[in-house]
């Protein structure tokens, strides 16, 4: 694994194996981005910062997006580092809970990447991985994203938007609702 359970002895081999496997998709124009999703337990500490830098270097031939689930990573130094490397900072929509990333529409690369995880605050820390992401966005919640998406789209050459999907399948309905709002705003 490259982001969740990293083995210091094998991560580089894992990254090279991943790169070899994904290269044909990139060469065929079928790979929009590689998302590196780091869990809440990935802290802004020297060892983790060093690892992130090495991993981004190993995968630098790919269009990269980095998703941090820990607010510690949302400082000016990290943002500038991502811009210098032309790596997208994944904007995440999550519950507004202590320690989680802030709502952000920062664009750090030609690619902008947004993930909607839902705002199920009651199950975020106590639920399992399925119930944590069960969430049906209201039209108002999604509508508030339209100006953000417009601004991101104006700054980036490509905007990717994803919804986290689990047992109830809310992602498809949420995506359709956002698509309707985006079309009404002439964004899509």
Model-derived features with residue positions:
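Residues lining hydrophobic/aromatic ligand-binding pockets adjacent to catalytic sites
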Residues: 1-188
